[in-house]
Amino acid sequence: MFMDFAMLPPEVNSTRMYSGPGAGSLWAAAAAWDQVSAELQSAAETYRSVIASLTGWQWLGPSSVRMGAAVTPYVEWLTTTAAQARQTATQITAAATGFEQAFAMTVPPPAIMANRAQVLSLIATNFFGQNTAAIAALETQYAEMWEQDATAMYDYAATSAAARTLTPFTSPQQDTNSAGLPAQSAEVSRATANAGAADGNWLGNLLEEIGILLLPIAPELTPFFLEAGEIVNAIPFPSIVGDEFCLLDGLLAWYATIGSINNINSMGTGIIGAEKNLGILPELGSAAAAAAPPPADIAPAFLAPLTSMAKSLSDGALRGPGEVSAAMRGAGTIGQMSVPPAWKAPAVTTVRAFDATPMTTLPGGDAPAAGVPGLPGMPASGAGRAGVVPRYGVRLTVMTRPLSGG
């Protein structure tokens, strides 16, 4: 409601403008509303970012979709309220600006009082009309002050009226269901009672997963698949997946058994290979005895245990009871080739030592047979090469003639 500021003298309008609290409170209110708007907008953006991160990557499922649908209205309310708070701050800023403009246009009260004092003084001394022109000029100035104050007040009133036009604030709607806790308890009880038949809900779960996967590319199809999944889950399907998994468990157990048998077979193969390698011990013992005969007093005591142990190992001492026995190493050998026992091994050529030279007096001797039976090409340990290295001539020492000899 506008007042008729033109009917009020400038003393009243100027006094009102200069006696008020000023625009300081308006500027403080505008800053406060602007801060409220920024906080609401930040909260809305944070909500939106967190929900997008949860429902898009980390949290998938019907609960995620329902949570997003429930919290979306609240995020929209935050955004709308932030815009309204920003509008309020803008309007208050406009009102403060209008006040400062009106204050600048208003005539200061001391100037009005000085004008009135001069007029009264001139009227008091105007005996012969000599002050009439001066009084008229002061009255004209006073009328201009009146008009100026009235204009300032009208402009300020219009600005304040526009600033008071605001959109009403609304409260956020309730985004929770009061019947949620009882429904959750009932659902938990039903799931516990039907835990044995949970395998029949695979089709409903599949439909719900399809609906969730379609959310980024076709959100309009998501509600259809979610509702279809809930309907299918409500149907009491028989438990058919359990039998299939029992069959798979049996196949896996059979595969594990076959693997164990293969491991046992590999172990037996390793033992047989070790037995074959141990069969060479008697030949090594015989070759060692032939290459370097030990003294007669210790030869039987030393070689008998070694030969007996090698013989027992090579004849199958490692075989367990109840196994199939087989004879090994019955064939003869010529070089690296196995031959029938009737074949005769070629005679081993004897390598003689170097013949004695006229420069030596030690006679030569026959060298022992080279090689180990069963391992051709392997030199026997201690195969001697008897004889002394021949000497060809004697190095002579020549002495020079001493100086004292003359």
UniProtKB/Swiss-Prot annotation:
Pfam families from the UniProt entry: PPE (PF00823), PPE-SVP (PF12484)
Family designation: Belongs to the mycobacterial PPE family.
InterPro entries: PPE_C, PPE_dom, PPE_sf
Protein name: Uncharacterized PPE family protein PPE61
Name of the coding gene: PPE61
GO BP annotation list: response to host immune response
